[in-house]
Swiss-Prot record:
It comes from Azotobacter vinelandii (strain DJ / ATCC BAA-1303). This is Large ribosomal subunit protein bL20. Keywords: Ribonucleoprotein, Ribosomal protein, RNA-binding, rRNA-binding. HAMAP family: Ribosomal_bL20. GO terms for cellular component: ribonucleoprotein complex; ribosome. CDD domains: Ribosomal_L20. Belongs to the bacterial ribosomal protein bL20 family. One of its GO terms (molecular function) is rRNA binding.
């Protein structure tokens, strides 16, 4: 039975990990053992934060809508309740964009919500 040497495979595996660790500080980008741990941890953070990003953006949109609504004399919860009653189906992303960039259009939407609530 011939001897199987795995140097090529190990080199390939090491190169792959070190390539992923490129740009890391100090030993994290140079030493395989440390780099491997850093890459695994980075992957865990990336996985977690892809989910957190969705929550964070929703929170940002709600904060912007609330600020815009209060400038027009209505709280966020009352605005959303009014929009639901008026069957105006605009998602929070679009509403926040309107509140920031199109103040007149947002004010018109708030007025419609106010009219339904009154």
């Amino acid at each position: 039975m011939a001897r199987v040497k795995r140097g090529v495979i190990a080199r390939r595996r090491h190169k792959k990990i070190l390539k992923l660790a490129k740009g890391y500080y100090g030993a994290r980008s140079r030493v395989f053992r440390v780099a491997k741990q850093a890459v695994i941890k980075a992957g865990q953070y990336a996985y977690r934060d892809r989910r957190q990003r969705k929550r964070q953006f929703r929170a940002l949109w709600i904060a912007r809508i609330n600020a815009g609504a209060r400038q027009n004399g209505l709280s966020y919860s009352r605005l959303i309740a009014g929009l639901k009653k008026a069957t105006i189906e605009i998602d929070r992303k679009v509403l926040s964009d309107l509140a920031v960039n199109e103040k007149a259009a947002f004010a018109a939407i708030v007025e419609k919500a106010k009219a339904v609530l009154a």
